[in-house]
């Protein structure tokens, strides 16, 4: 999972950086780049999960810290990242950054490198919500067709002129309609949808959750207490588009769903495994226990479901903290997965900001304050050691969603939700044939 907290230092001896003297033969930019590269090398050599695979490349050999960071990473690593816009990234992860307020899936036209996008969801009150809805098709970006290399432009802040598409049989064609949206800063509450359904003796709560961020734990409290007041017997948790996020938020969510008698505050919830040098040090000193183990926390909204079962909707975009949540819940209650196979990311990333050593203390490097690195530092498992492979989690009930059918999230006829409702009520559901596109986080 990606953690949004800054680890300024776990302890000084492991984070000690080699000071860099200014060299009059190099430009100030070169000196700053070298200093940043030294910081990268120092932290990866200490905390990186695959620390023993880091190549011996000198910090001064690269002028671009992003390039230097990349060449040090293991071939196993698809996730570690670096940014020179620390505030922007942290705001995005906290759900308070600049955004258009939509989630998109992408596809490629047959026999072409040209792509299209389909709206998965929009946040209420967002720029996208004013003009777009789930199922809308985008075929042009700023009056031009677009390829895979252009996809990031659909989420980068600014103003977009989107050429819309329409279905014509099995094909997609331009509709002639153009939509203009401008990004803005907003609070993107990850509790996107809450609904109640009744099926026979079952009162079912449905919650669509798009991102793990403790900024919005209060939204979980509000939603779950409303579910409790309604007397729900069953929960459907929709994580199909949840790419992960804050470990504190996932711990909180687990603590609110696991049956109350088992979710005792301070009881072990999950385990973390670091590289061998870090693991040895952490195990030798109890002050680092929270880096090895995570524990149930107080939530004031535990559902204490009578069924002691939860239904979770999944896809290939169910990633990291979402998978952590599924794994942890499995150790304490029945978990039924509905949808398609999850992504398969069972590692934790920590954020480090540039610092240097001064008089035995670590001091923030103000000249590099805009930089931040997020290396993979540990693997997670539940208390039973699951998951123990690199494969995604396969649902017991496979259902492929169809973004082309125009059915909105939270609608009882939406295929994944409809399947979960049918499983809870014990009724059979006829799966409609439809088209699906592959997506990835």
Where are these regions (language model features)?
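C-terminal "post-core" interaction segments
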Residues: 216-227, 232-234, 243-441
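Short strand-loop junctions, especially beta-strand C-caps/beta-turns
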Residues: 122, 210-212, 240-242, 313-316
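Bacterial N-terminal signal peptides that target proteins for export
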Residues: 1-8
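Flexible, low-complexity junctional segments that flank or bridge functional domains
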Residues: 21-234, 256-259, 431, 435-441
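A general structural signal for short secondary-structure junctions and capping/turn motifs
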Residues: 4, 92-95, 152-154, 197-198, ...
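C-terminal motif of bacterial Sec signal peptides marking the signal peptidase cleavage site
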Residues: 16-19
């Amino acid at each position: 999972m990606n953690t949004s907290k800054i680890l300024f230092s776990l302890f000084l001896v492991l984070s000690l950086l080699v000071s860099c003297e200014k060299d009059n033969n190099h430009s100030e930019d070169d000196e700053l780049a070298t200093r940043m590269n030294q910081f990268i090398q120092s932290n990866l050599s200490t905390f990186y999960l695959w620390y023993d695979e880091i190549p011996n490349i000198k910090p001064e050999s690269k002028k671009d810290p992003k390039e230097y960071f990349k060449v040090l990473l293991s071939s196993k690593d698809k996730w570690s990242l670096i940014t020179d816009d620390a505030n922007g990234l942290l705001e995005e992860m906290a759900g308070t950054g600049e955004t258009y307020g939509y989630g998109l899936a992408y596809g490629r036209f047959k026999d072409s490198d040209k792509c299209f996008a389909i709206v998965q969801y929009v946040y209420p009150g967002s720029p996208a919500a004013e003009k777009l809805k789930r199922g809308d098709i985008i075929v042009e970006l700023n009056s031009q067709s677009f390829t895979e290399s252009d996809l990031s432009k659909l989420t980068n802040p600014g103003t977009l002129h989107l050429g819309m598409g329409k279905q014509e049989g099995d094909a997609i064609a331009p509709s002639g309609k153009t939509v203009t949206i401008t990004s803005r800063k907003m609070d993107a509450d990850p509790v996107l949808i809450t609904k109640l359904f009744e099926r026979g003796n079952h009162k079912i709560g449905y919650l669509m959750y798009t991102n793990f961020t403790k900024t919005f734990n209060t939204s979980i409290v509000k939603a779950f207490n409303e579910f409790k007041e309604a007397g729900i017997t069953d929960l459907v948790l929709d994580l199909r588009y949840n790419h992960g996020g804050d470990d504190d938020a996932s711990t909180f969510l687990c603590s609110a769903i696991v049956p109350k008698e088992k979710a005792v505050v301070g009881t072990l919830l999950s385990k973390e495994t670091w590289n061998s040098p870090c693991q040895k040090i952490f195990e030798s000193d109890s002050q680092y226990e929270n880096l090895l183990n995570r524990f149930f926390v107080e939530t004031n909204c535990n559902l204490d479901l009578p069924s002691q079962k939860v239904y979770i909707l999944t896809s290939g975009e169910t990633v990291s903290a979402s998978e952590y949540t599924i794994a942890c819940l499995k150790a304490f209650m029945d978990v039924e997965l509905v949808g398609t196979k999850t992504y398969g990311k069972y590692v934790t990333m920590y954020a480090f900001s540039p610092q240097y050593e001064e008089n035995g203390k670590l001091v923030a490097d103000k000249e590099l304050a805009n930089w931040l690195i997020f290396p993979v530092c540990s693997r997670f498992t539940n208390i039973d050691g699951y998951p123990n492979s690199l494969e995604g989690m396969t649902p017991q009930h496979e259902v492929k969603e169809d973004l082309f059918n125009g059915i909105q999230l939270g609608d009882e006829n939406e295929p994944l939700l409809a399947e979960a409702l049918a499983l809870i009520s014990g009724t059979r559901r006829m799966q409609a044939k439809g088209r699906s596109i592959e997506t990835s986080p």
